[in-house]
Amino acid sequence: MSEVNAGEICYVKKQRKGTINPNKICQPIGAMWATVGVKGTIPFVQGSQGCTTYVRYAFNRHFREPVSIATASFHEHAA
């Protein structure tokens, strides 16, 4: 670690040896990944649309084809 002084702001600069991939530590993504691997199934997310959109985007980038994921589309007004 090294201390860097930028005018009046002083911060510590850290050097990391690795990176954390959120896709590898996210349990819902793991469950959806397992469901996509079973023929004739569609993953269902009982949550917000944003969570499903992120997973769709990640899967589309990985598989390079559209992936269907169903969602309940919950939002704060439904509570």
Curated annotation (Swiss-Prot):
Gene3D superfamilies: Nitrogenase molybdenum iron protein domain (3.40.50.1980). GO terms for biological process: nitrogen fixation. Binds 1 [8Fe-7S] cluster per heterodimer. InterPro entries: ChlB/BchB/BchZ, Nase/OxRdtase_comp1. [8Fe-7S] cluster binds at residues 26, 51. Its cofactor is [8Fe-7S] cluster. Pfam families: Oxidored_nitro. GO terms for molecular function: ATP binding; iron-sulfur cluster binding; metal ion binding; nitrogenase activity. It is an enzyme of class 1 (oxidoreductase). It comes from the Archaea. Disulfide bonds: none annotated. Tetramer of two alpha and two beta chains. Forms complex with the iron protein (nitrogenase component 2). This molybdenum-iron protein is part of the nitrogenase complex that catalyzes the key enzymatic reactions in nitrogen fixation. Belongs to the NifD/NifK/NifE/NifN family. This is Nitrogenase molybdenum-iron protein beta chain. It comes from Methanothermococcus thermolithotrophicus.
